[in-house]
Amino acid sequence: MSRPLTVVQLLPALDSGGVERGTLEIARALVAAGHRSLVVSAGGRLVDALTREGSEHIALDVGRKSLASLWLVPKLRRLFAERGVDIVHARSRLPAWLGFLAWRGMDVATRPRFVTTVHGLNSVGFYSAVMLRGERVICVSQTVRDYVLRHYPDSDASRLRVIARGVDPLEFPHGHRPDRDWRKRFVAEHPALSTPAPWLCLVGRGSRIKGHRHAIELVADLRHQGSDARLILLGVREPGRERYVDELRRLAQRLGVGDAVVMTAPRRDVRDVMASCRLVLQLSSQPEAFGRTVLEALHLGVPVLGYDIGGVGEQLRALFAPGAVAPGDPAALAERARVLLQQDLRPPPFSSHGLAQMQEATLSLYRELQEAPRRCI
């Protein structure tokens, strides 16, 4: 039986987001498999959950964009040596630079193995290229792998591994329906939803690239076609985004659907909101690396309508092809929405993209690399 590993994950902070969630998911899997899990970050609200599940958190501000951060390089090198670290897994660019510099200064024969994960379609250049310095480079989708090879043609394709993010089917079970009390409370909070009209939902922070305008225009187009609907912009109300929210409200009023649009702050009951909708929208104007919301909705059995670009298009083509539409064609978007609502098409259950599969693939990669021949990078 192979010996337990000591794995350290590096990221800026542990507050919220897909990178942070993935870090906790791998930390949990390491502990469950009998390995030692260390996480280095500046801290955040997820630290308690991390340590409760058996990992150790080491507070270092490896995400601070300052020359002073270079002083952390010898600290990290000492940490790797003193803790007997087997795998260093960097999940963000600045932590990757600090981790790489610390790792590169160690003895090739005894230093840890170095892994990176490319979580996004980062700007192309020297700073981002550090994410390709890993002895193994995890890409969270085929879209990311293609992007890396297109923009960094000298990359060693043999070191790239596609390991898609996973969704826990127990957390997002197919056919889930929230209880009546939840729905009553939610409608009481948002009286615009009290009509029989179907609900549409777009989950995303208050950013212009998330497609909120396109969603409002879609609801207006549906109304003009005689198909009434209600739109929930879940998570758009954030501190500092008040002007943007006002802009969206004015747009809805100008298009005659001010009574049909609900805008909320980020919520913990995203699963129940999505499960109550007839359509979940993913209309980001820029390609995304993955699009976790798409996968969560499809796992619930809720149709997703999204642009056929990036990781969103990749998932829809594989799991729910009727939901993929070309960007930049509002008429086609409205027609596809009308058809999906009218025919009540539902994605069938599927076993791929599970959380356990992602965890198993990542731990297998660690073990594969630990046993692989060493070489200078």
Give short role names for the model-derived ranges.
Residues 17-25, 198, 202-221:
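A conserved mid-protein helix/loop that constitutes part of the nucleotide-sugar donor-binding site
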Residues 18, 171-178, 342-374:
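A charged, aromatic-enriched C-terminal amphipathic alpha-helix characteristic of glycosyltransferases
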Residues 318-331, 339-343:
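Conserved acidic donor-binding segment of nucleotide-sugar-dependent glycosyltransferases
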Residues 90-96, 118:
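Short His-centered aromatic/hydrophobic patch
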Residues 104, 108-142, 154:
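A conserved, positively charged/aromatic
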Residues 240-245, 258-267, 273:
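Active-site donor-binding acidic/aromatic loop of nucleotide-activated sugar
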Residues 39, 303-306:
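Short hydrophobic beta-strand element within catalytic cores of glycosyltransferases
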Residues 275-289, 302:
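Acidic donor-binding loop of glycosyltransferase active sites
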